[in-house]
């Protein structure tokens, strides 16, 4: 289809899976057709939460204590004690995430996650607020505070009324500026281009020491409930402007 249409540029609006992990980006590279968003390597690394956190750490970004669980690992002997969060290492959109509050839930988790054919990442739970920052062509837009009844699940992300987005986030100026700075550094550390969105967890009681980067998304959602269009609108950019910027930045071999 792509060869028949022979487009000048491909706007990659895919989300998750092969559309986000470097696979489709690799196809565009083989076809030598410029495409939007991040390239093969950046996309693949960002999709691997464990590896991307290692890179963030080398660039001085604070990350949460974690442990990578392989298929044969059992949860009983892990050093990180509840409360913690466990999620697919290469997943997205909060699919498959479990929040474990009590040790009694471990056996249930062993049945769910033990001997599976994919890796999972276990992270110490950090109480506090969920913050996020979009970066467009290297510049941060603003900080959004994501308010939910419990935690930012799949339903909270995509269902109308599932979460409340406070723009700009009502947080201290130093934390606000730190979020912007961290988001740009994360974008640069993975060699990303186009638009990305970095998610943070902030424990208010600990101030600057309580701010952690969770992950970076190279294919952030662009729906009416999505965070990037909301942030862009707040800073005076409409969806058309974002799309034009991404198309102008489209390229191969980056």
Walk through the language-model features, giving the residues of each.
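Active-site nucleotide/adenylate-binding loops and adjacent lid/helix of ATP-dependent enzymes
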Residues: 2-4, 45-123, 127-128, 181
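A glycine- and small-aliphatic-rich helix-loop capping segment at beta-alpha/alpha-beta transitions
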Residues: 26-35, 102-107, 234-235
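Conserved N-proximal alpha/beta basic substrate-recognition cap immediately N-terminal to
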Residues: 1-65
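Conserved metal-phosphate-binding beta-hairpin within the catalytic cores
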Residues: 124, 133, 187-222, 232
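Glycine/Thr-rich phosphate-binding loops of Rossmann-like dinucleotide-binding domains
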Residues: 20-21, 94, 131
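C-terminal active-site "lid" helix and adjoining low-complexity regulatory extension at the edge
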Residues: 206-254
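Phosphate-binding site of ATP-dependent enzymes
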Residues: 101-181, 201, 206-212
């Amino acid at each position: 289809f792509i060869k028949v249409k022979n487009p000048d540029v491909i706007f990659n609006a895919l989300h998750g899976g092969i559309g986000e992990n470097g696979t489709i980006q690799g196809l565009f590279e083989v076809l030598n057709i410029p495409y939007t968003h991040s390239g093969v390597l950046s996309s693949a690394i960002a999709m691997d939460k464990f590896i991307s956190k290692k890179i963030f750490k080398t660039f001085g970004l604070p990350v949460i204590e974690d442990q990578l669980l392989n298929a044969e690992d059992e949860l009983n002997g892990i050093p990180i004690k509840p409360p913690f969060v466990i999620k697919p290492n290469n997943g997205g959109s909060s699919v498959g995430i479990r929040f474990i509050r009590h040790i009694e839930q471990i056996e249930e988790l062993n049945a769910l996650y033990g001997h599976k054919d994919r890796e999972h990442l276990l992270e110490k739970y950090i109480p506090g607020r969920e913050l996020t920052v979009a970066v467009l062509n290297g510049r941060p837009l603003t900080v959004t505070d994501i308010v939910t009844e419990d935690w930012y699940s799949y339903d909270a992300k995509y269902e109308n009324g599932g979460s409340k987005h406070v723009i700009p986030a009502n947080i201290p100026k130093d934390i606000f500026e730190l979020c912007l700075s961290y988001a740009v550094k994360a974008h640069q550390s993975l060699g990303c281009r186009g638009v990305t969105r970095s998610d943070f967890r902030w424990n208010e009681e600990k101030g600057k020491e309580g701010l952690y980067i969770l992950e970076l998304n190279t294919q952030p959602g662009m729906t009416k409930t999505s965070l990037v269009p909301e942030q862009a609108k707040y800073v005076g950019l409409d969806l058309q402007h974002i799309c034009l910027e991404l198309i102008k930045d489209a390229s191969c071999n980056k």
